[in-house]
């Protein structure tokens, strides 16, 4: 009979276990008293242990026919609670087989163990290892986005009464939140680093305790009209990130001599920042303000380099931004895709309503690298416009004006991307080999060299300039000859809209000038607007008026008369033959020779005629 009873209880226990496994959705709500008693030891456990407790729900409970609560087996891999839970289940099963009356006590013990094991408030999981950060972000702290969702969603899932108890218990356990309004938590892996979520007023941060010990703070989803930067909660921070919120203005300034090294206010729809907001932050290395509605960047007035991210601010104005670029040491993050709006009266840029920061930086380089020539003065450099090249990539055109300085040679170095060089009204006699060997001359396509003493343009032969130029101004120089290479190659591709100006140069005119140069000027008259003003130095004529017949005559030579001499000899021979024939006819018919022939002495050959 006893064996039968034990078998019945064993069968009943197996059926209950099978039912619990088949219906895992039946959850057990932990006892608040047990939660308060047992949460403290586990709350201070290693974050990894807290993570495992959160990963598994509490064990479901079933009741037997006598109303006794029997726990279902817990299948878990928790490092902390697995031993206790498994042991309790095994013990309950063993006692049920030996003594049915002991099931209730065993079950109660198992339930207590299960509750205490899983009663810890849902802490944040450990984030994955972050990739190595760039140098400018080495002092920046960013809490992972899932930390906010995990921590505060976990609290929301509990009932109203339990949520209050859990919040108070967690605040006491962490020692950092002495007020229930505090919406901040300490980061699980970074010491002295805190994150706050869903902030609607700064008191949700300032109500936390030990704020003075905080080093890093990341606030997500802050929704306020004005954020006061002078609040003491920011005094001791080295890294402050306020992201993904809705803030209208940043008012006031950070405290004097703030320790802040990294500041990120991205993705907040901010439209205004106090002009002196970061003026007294001497150690600031990174300032991220991307994806807002800002039109101005606050001044720093600091000499230290800073990395700045203004991408995504489509209302940013170019004029004040350009002033900051010139006066402060700033490295822009993603300058190709950071844009600003410029005043339409500017002439730097060509047919666009927005300008990239990269173009503004190029303008600064154009000006700061402008040539300064000892004993002569400084050139004037401007970024006149933007030239669109292949793949829609813009390239700045730096124009260098070194006119009226009295230079005797070209500048040694030009700014990068110099497309126009103006050296008019100087005393330059030679172009030298700059267009061959100096890389800063390779992009020039406009050369203004009027009113100098340049005597030759042979230096252009074989250069990139002769292939890509658009304008050459060489008026009123000392050119004596235009080389044949230049004539054959300078205007081969008229599709580039090339123009050459040579008026005021007095060339050495000769037969070759009349034949080759004159024809070249006539054929390319549309590309040489002042071709009518090119004159000769050795005759008072313009090149276009030269006459080939006059210039191409050869000096007198005896070979020119040989044909006349031959013709005269032929005529003389014919006359002699005619005279001899006539005398012979007279002698035969009249018997005497004409008087001239009778006076001539006899020759040895006369006997031929006397026979």
Curated annotation (Swiss-Prot):
Which residue stretches does the UniProt record annotate as biased composition, category Basic residues?
43-59
Species name: Drosophila melanogaster (Fruit fly)
Return the protein name.
Protein halfway
Per the database record, which ranges form the LRRNT domain?
A: 361-416
GO annotation terms (biological process): intracellular signal transduction; pupariation; response to ecdysone
Any idea where the LRRCT domain is?
505-554
Keywords tagged on the record:
Glycoprotein, Leucine-rich repeat, Repeat, Signal
**InterPro entries, per this entry?**
Leu-rich_rpt (IPR001611), LRR_dom_sf (IPR032675), SLRP (IPR050333)
């Amino acid at each position: 009979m006893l064996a039968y009873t034990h078998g019945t209880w064993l069968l009943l226990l197996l059926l209950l276990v099978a039912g619990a496994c088949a219906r895992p959705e039946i959850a057990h709500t932990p006892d608040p008293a047990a939660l308060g008693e047992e949460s403290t030891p586990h709350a201070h456990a290693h974050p990894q242990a807290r993570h495992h407790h959160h990963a598994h729900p509490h064990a479901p409970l079933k009741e037997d026919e006598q109303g006794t609560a029997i726990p279902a087996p817990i299948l878990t891999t928790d490092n902390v609670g697995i031993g206790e839970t498994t042991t309790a289940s095994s013990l309950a099963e063993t006692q049920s087989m030996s003594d049915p009356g002991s099931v209730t006590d065993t079950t109660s013990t198992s339930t207590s163990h299960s509750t205490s094991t899983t009663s810890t408030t849902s802490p944040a999981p450990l984030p994955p290892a972050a990739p190595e950060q760039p140098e400018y972000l080495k002092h920046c702290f960013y809490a992972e986005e899932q930390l906010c969702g995990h921590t505060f969603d976990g609290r929301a899932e509990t009932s109203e009464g339990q949520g209050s108890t859990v919040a108070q218990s967690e605040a006491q356990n962490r020692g950092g939140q002495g007020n229930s309004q505090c919406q901040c938590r300490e980061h699980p892996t970074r010491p002295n680093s805190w994150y706050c979520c869903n902030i609607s007023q700064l008191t949700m941060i300032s109500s936390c305790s030990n704020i003075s010990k905080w080093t890093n703070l990341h606030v997500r989803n802050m929704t306020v009209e004005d954020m006061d930067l002078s609040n003491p909660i920011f005094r001791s921070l080295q890294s402050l990130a306020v992201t993904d919120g809705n803030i209208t203005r940043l008012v006031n300034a950070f405290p004097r001599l703030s320790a802040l090294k990294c500041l990120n206010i991205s993705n907040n729809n901010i439209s205004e920042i106090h002009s002196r907001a970061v003026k007294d932050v001497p150690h600031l290395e990174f300032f991220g303000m991307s994806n807002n509605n800002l039109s101005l960047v606050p001044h720093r007035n600091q000499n230290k380099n800073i990395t700045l991210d203004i991408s995504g601010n489509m209302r940013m104005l170019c004029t004040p931004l350009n002033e900051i670029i010139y006066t402060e040491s700033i490295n822009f993050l993603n300058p190709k895709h950071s844009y600003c709006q410029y005043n339409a009266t500017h002439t730097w840029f060509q047919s666009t309503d927005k300008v990239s920061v990269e173009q503004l930086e190029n303008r600064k380089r154009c000006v700061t690298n402008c040539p300064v020539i000892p004993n002569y003065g400084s050139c004037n450099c401007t970024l006149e416009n933007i030239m669109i090249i292949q793949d829609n990539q813009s390239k700045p055109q730096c124009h260098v004006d070194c006119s009226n300085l009295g230079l005797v040679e070209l500048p040694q170095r030009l700014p990068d991307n110099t497309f126009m060089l103006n050296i008019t009204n100087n005393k330059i006699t030679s172009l030298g080999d700059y267009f061959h060997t100096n890389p800063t001359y390779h992009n020039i396509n406009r050369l203004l060299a009027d009113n100098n003493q340049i005597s030759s343009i042979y230096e252009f032969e074989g250069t990139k300039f002769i292939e890509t130029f658009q304008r050459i101004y060489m008026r009123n120089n000392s050119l004596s000859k235009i080389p044949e290479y230049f004539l054959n190659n300078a205007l081969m591709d008229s599709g580039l809209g090339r123009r050459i100006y040579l008026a005021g140069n007095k060339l050495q005119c000769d037969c070759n000038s009349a034949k080759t140069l004159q024809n070249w000027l006539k054929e390319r008259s549309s590309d040489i607007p002042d071709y009518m003003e090119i004159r000769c130095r050795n005759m008072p004529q313009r090149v276009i008026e030269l006459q080939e017949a006059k210039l191409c005559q050869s000096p007198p030579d005896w070979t020119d008369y040989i044909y006349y001499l031959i013709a005269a000899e032929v005529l003389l021979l014919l006359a002699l033959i005619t005279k001899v024939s006539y005398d012979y006819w007279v002698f035969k018919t009249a018997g005497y020779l004409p008087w001239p022939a009778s006076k001539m002495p006899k020759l040895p050959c006369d006997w031929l005629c006397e026979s």
